Amino acid sequence: MDFKDINEKIDTVEGFFQPLDQYIWDWILTLQNEENLFGHLVEFGVYKGKSLCKLAQHQKVGEHILGVDCSLSLEGMKTSVMNAVKKTSNISLAYVNLLDCMTEYLYTTRYTSEGGATTEFRNKARFLHIDAGHSGYNVYEDLKLADRYLSPNGILVMDDWTTRFYPDLVDAFYRYIITNPNSFKILMISECKMYACRPKEYSNYIWRMETKMIPFMKEHYNKPIKIFKTKNYVDSAKLVIMHESEYSKVDPQDNAIDVLV
């Protein structure tokens, strides 16, 4: 797969999606495909469909794309998103499902496509991205459905994790995992997003990130980056990935980090 080419296509879609995260998604989704991990691709908060198009680029036959966003009820929005998916990927639009509702609705309702078929998402999503309402209430409700949908070896991504304008977002996540300790465990923080998995898969994904993601990013991402790992506590080590210019602001004497690249 030509990652530069597919990301240039993504850049033609209106919206917000950091290039660094685009390549991180490419690595995760490619890894899952190489390891024959089957599962649906889900997004809460679609906007113009920019990141949904990235999911569509990695969809395998039989997998469904599900986008949930109340703004999809606006005139022309669904058509606009579908057109964006069509021009950036080769996916059959029959597998793209767009819903204009709150995630609370789906928590109590099995999703039925416009064709009448029922698609089961419970424990079936291998990749789930949350970028919807940023209030504590909205995020908590999104996490409830994400916990229901995410497969045992799936990846959860949350947007705007490092944006200080949305403190409720981080607070809601920690409130959720304190109440539901077997739900999610943080793997990595980028300059914008947080990446998590099921706790039982944590060591497997951390190992893959340390041994496989670094070579991938060196080969395909054309900007200098730093990846480092917190090491205060062995059982809660996290990876952090950022551009070298941002890393220069980190205190080099900080013994809480272990620079990997």
Functional labels for PLM-detected ranges:
Residues 2-15, 22, 26-261:
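S-adenosylmethionine/decaboxylated-SAM
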